[in-house]
Amino acid sequence: MTASDCRSIDQAFLAQQWPSRQATLERYLQEQSRGLRQVFVAEDSGQIAGYATLIPHAKAGPFKKNGYPEITDLNVFQNFQRQGIGAKLLQAAEEQAKTFSSVITIGVGLHS
């Protein structure tokens, strides 16, 4: 992910009537530069379609003590859903995780 991607992703959230995620995305960019997170960005025809992040060691939850990598914050924007983009993002994160672990986890949030 680049600084430009942060702005484009935030604009995509705003276009969907979601709150700004700029601060979170900038934190992801900083963590990526320090090797604490990897961000996978999907594009379609030059537009940001979605993204997923991979952290090398779960920071919370039942897998924290095992040090397993965790896929977090998977988003595919509405205009790009049902095209296999989410599956490709998951596959990219899984392939990267395979380079340093035989186990991978996924963190999910529950929203009402």
Q: How should these model regions be labeled?
A:
Residues 1-9:
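A short beta-loop-alpha structural element at the N-terminal edge
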Residues 14-20, 60:
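N-terminal first-folded block
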Residues 64-78, 106-109:
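Conserved acetyl-CoA binding element of GNAT-fold acetyltransferases
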Residues 76, 82-95:
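Conserved acetyl-CoA-binding loop-helix of GNAT-fold acetyltransferases
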Residues 97-111:
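Conserved GNAT acetyl-CoA-binding A-motif
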